[in-house]
Amino acid sequence: MTALNLIPGQLSLAQLRDVYQNPVKLTLDNSASAQIEASVACVEQILAENRTAYGINTGFGLLASTRIASEDLENLQRSLVLSHAAGVGQPISDELVRLIMVLKVNSLSRGFSGIRRVVIDALIALINAEVYPHIPLKGSVGASGDLAPLAHMSLVLLGEGKARHKGEWMDATEALKVAGLTPLTLAAKEGLALLNGTQVSTAFALRGLFEGEDLFAGALALGGLTVEAVLGSRSPFDARIHAARGQKGQIDAAAAYRDLLGERSEVSDSHQNCEKVQDPYSLRCQPQVMGACLTQFRQAAEVLAIEANAVSDNPLVFAAEGDVISGGNFHAEPVAMAADNMALAIAEIGSLSERRISLMMDKHMSQLPPFLVANGGVNSGFMIAQVTAAALASENKALSHPHSVDSLPTSANQEDHVSMAPAAGKRLWEMAENTRGILAVEWLAAVQGLDLRNGLKTSAKLEQARGILRREVPFYEKDRFFAPDINAATELLASRILTELVPAKLLPSL
């Protein structure tokens, strides 16, 4: 379990990756208390002065002009949570729920939401006890915030709904006991503060970023393996080429390839005097394509790092001035656009890998046996594995269609433009799974191709990648049940073992 002392607004991408991947023991830094208390005092002052303020003593959405009597304020907050818990679909995974909850604690603790410390501490207690509310996967359009999923998260605090602890579902009252809690009664503004925000959208996109980074790292290593398997040239990775263009992502990707390939190997020495002048684009242009993908991940990471530390509640409480101001920080357009751009990168990583696989199948291009197997005709070898890769690459082309350009008005046209950020982030997971499958086939094919090179060795780092696979999957001497091999390679990729072969500084969250 990771220990994390949360200083509001200062979570790093590396910390967020750790929260997603591992249970966390969360504490809130003492520096947060003063601002939290000041925002609560501001809300209480507004009520004492009988001032009208949206979300504090009014209805919501199109009902914002309806003033709520003082005696109904607690019921208003409870009713808000209950009515907005209208999500559908499979439950979000524990890892993602944990990330969502930490993001929500981070935002609330900034002290612009008018929510008491006791409510924030209750969320922290659930996180630390590994009690994860049941949050359905679907039901948010990413404005006004992620209302339905965050309402499901908040239900448990009221003793409603259900939660999962160590893989077992239980009623909210039992779940609260596990965390040493009893049901809360929410004060004015608190229900809205819990529900309003982009934390679900941001968590979805962050998962896409983390998986995309790992796929990027794996694709670098496998692209290097394929260069060696088909007797490709190291010349296209020469630093001078990339410096002349000046694209930072391309320069860094080329440097990573040079690190993986090394200056020379037994394989490269074996064709030093060949007559081939240029390699196909899927080999030669890897730094250009992968560099562009790296730039997309880095830009998305910058946006998501800001959003993870943002206050995306509405209205916001500015305690120093005694003001409560309505705005639109709940609109997750930055997250949606970041996710859309990452979708392009994930699709391109898979597309480029599939082209390299296809190249290895062609004996004229690869100088290897057709479909990487002896006695072709009797044996089909990697023929249909490449077809599988093509199918996955094609799926990703459709999935990469932008979501941020879509919008449907809601709440009787009061909320007339929305971001669709949750859908933009969520489809990244399916795309990542598809690309992982493509890369798994390339890993199998590239190592098979190298093994057909009469015992020649590649560079030290690429030999590591070769050995990792061969410990799980034997050489393909003749046709056998192929799917288990792909599954084994896919599981190795999911373990992030190839990420360790590239410099950590290359990727934002490492």
UniProtKB/Swiss-Prot annotation:
Location(s), subcellular: Cytoplasm
The entry's keywords: Cytoplasm, Histidine metabolism, Lyase
Pathway note: Amino-acid degradation; L-histidine degradation into L-glutamate; N-formimidoyl-L-glutamate from L-histidine: step 1/3
SUPFAM superfamilies: L-aspartase-like
Covalent cross-link 5-imidazolinone (Ala-Gly) as placed by the record, residue numbers: A143-G145
Enzyme class: lyase
GO term, biological process aspect, one: L-histidine catabolic process to glutamate and formamide
CDD domains referenced in this protein's UniProt entry, alphabetically: PAL-HAL
Record GO cellular component, one term: cytoplasm
Catalysed transformations (reactions): L-histidine = trans-urocanate + NH4(+)
GO molecular function: histidine ammonia-lyase activity
Sites of 2,3-didehydroalanine (Ser) modification: S144
Domain of life: Bacteria
EC numbers, comma separated: 4.3.1.3
Record PTM: Contains an active site 4-methylidene-imidazol-5-one (MIO), which is formed autocatalytically by cyclization and dehydration of residues Ala-Ser-Gly.
Record-stated family: Belongs to the PAL/histidase family.
Name of this protein: Histidine ammonia-lyase
Natural source organism: Pseudomonas fluorescens (strain Pf0-1)
